[in-house]
Amino acid sequence: MRLVQLSRHSIAFPSPEGALREPNGLLALGGDLSPARLLMAYQRGIFPWFSPGDPILWWSPDPRAVLWPESLHISRSMKRFHKRSPYRVTMNYAFGQVIEGCASDREEGTWITRGVVEAYHRLHELGHAHSIEVWCEDELVGGMYGVAQGTLFCGESMFSRMENASKTALLVFCEEFIGHGGKLIDCQVLNDHTASLGACEIPRRDYLNYLNQMRLGRLPNNFWVPRCLFSPQE
């Protein structure tokens, strides 16, 4: 196993099975964040993640963290909160604001550089990247974004500026996703937060098998149309 240097003249990736064991999943470096390369990466179970100033690094970890939407864990306190939620939840109303929120709300620093913001905004304009927004009145207080692969959604990042805002985004999205034929959410790498919400780890080969099947599936044509998903009770 060795780290592969990508060419700017080809969007081809090596097999994820060749990724390093340490650091877990590191597969390649270099290339660019063009829409064609990003889409090729997601189709092969690969994603970019790197620190500012570093070369672009491409990953496919083993095991892979995923969330089956029907297994989303909602605590009793969250259920009570959601019944009286003050939030309105929308889809694809403010992609740019959501990714900017994810970039600026990370206390430990962020991998979401200006180049990353621009790259995913291009994917959004092409209809591949999508956002969920959480509003308190007219203020954006939380949200999440990711990349669609048929009936699989590759979650990238979320942020929260008010109580339970990001959890509300995920809860409402999961309900909508399941209801329209969505199957699986990719969480990339397990952490305490995603584990508390019901995410689990599966072998990379299983994830790649699911991806190869689900990316050929289809949600309704109007699923990603900008719309309101949830409004607070009057």
Curated annotation (Swiss-Prot):
Q: Where in the cell is it found?
A: Cytoplasm
The record's EC number reads 2.3.2.6
Name any GO cellular component annotation: cytoplasm
Which reactions appear under catalytic activity for this entry? N-terminal L-lysyl-[protein] + L-leucyl-tRNA(Leu) = N-terminal L-leucyl-L-lysyl-[protein] + tRNA(Leu) + H(+); N-terminal L-arginyl-[protein] + L-leucyl-tRNA(Leu) = N-terminal L-leucyl-L-arginyl-[protein] + tRNA(Leu) + H(+); L-phenylalanyl-tRNA(Phe) + an N-terminal L-alpha-aminoacyl-[protein] = an N-terminal L-phenylalanyl-L-alpha-aminoacyl-[protein] + tRNA(Phe)
| Keyword terms of this UniProt record | Acyltransferase, Cytoplasm, Transferase
Q: Which GO terms describe its biological process?
A: protein catabolic process
Which InterPro entries does the record cross-reference, listed alphabetically? Acyl_CoA_acyltransferase, Leu/Phe-tRNA_Trfase, Leu/Phe-tRNA_Trfase_C, Leu/Phe-tRNA_Trfase_N
Q: Tell me a Gene Ontology molecular-function term this record carries.
A: leucyl-tRNA--protein transferase activity
Q: What is its main location?
A: cytoplasm
Please report which protein family the annotation says this sequence is part of. Answer: Belongs to the L/F-transferase family.
Q: Which HAMAP family match?
A: Leu_Phe_trans
Function of the protein = Functions in the N-end rule pathway of protein degradation where it conjugates Leu, Phe and, less efficiently, Met from aminoacyl-tRNAs to the N-termini of proteins containing an N-terminal arginine or lysine.
Kindly give the PANTHER family that the UniProt entry links to this protein. Answer: LEUCYL/PHENYLALANYL-TRNA--PROTEIN TRANSFERASE (PTHR30098), LEUCYL_PHENYLALANYL-TRNA--PROTEIN TRANSFERASE (PTHR30098:SF2)
Q: What is this protein called?
A: Leucyl/phenylalanyl-tRNA--protein transferase
User: Where does this protein come from, organism-wise?
Assistant: Escherichia coli O6:H1 (strain CFT073 / ATCC 700928 / UPEC)
Q: Which gene encodes it?
A: aat
